[in-house]
Amino acid sequence: ENARIRNNLADGINFAQGTKNSTVKNSNIRGNGDDGLAIWSSISDGTNAAAEENNKFLNNTIESGWRAAGIGIFGGKGHEISGNLIKDVFAGAGIRVNTVFAGHNFDLNDSGIKIHDNTILRSGTTNDLYNLHRGAIDFQQVRGTIKNVAIYDNKLLNTLAEPVITKNFEMGDNGNGEIRLSNNTIDNK
């Protein structure tokens, strides 16, 4: 709580290897070379870690990341991402939700993940480190399906890439049943 993290070459904070019931709150994360905040439900290196569970990122400012997302969610269950200001992430998405890495991903997500009441300002790119297009919110499914995620009441402002929400699978304007999008404001004036 109330932390300041500046200019490192990796994630600002990464909950991994079975982290449960942990919160980053009222903190400022700036200038990171990977995700500002991340939840990574990994089982890499032959570990038998449990899935990430019930973690929260609340009322933080994440700014000026230069390689990845402001906030990255790579699986687990029961997380809440709320009240964050994510701004000036010029080389990636403001919020990234995906199954790119091996791990528990969203297979055990029976309690749902809520991403709401965040403001994403001047984020996204047409050419990230992997030569991919990332919107203010980006979904990518590689190793399994993203499921039971609700994204609502967020503000996506002055985004740096179109479309504002990017994905590598079929999904309508309101989601696809497993991902629910509602009442998100997009303003690129």
Where do the language-model regions lie?
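Extracellular beta-strand/beta-solenoid scaffold signature
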Residues: N7-F15, G31-N48, E52, S64-I73, ...
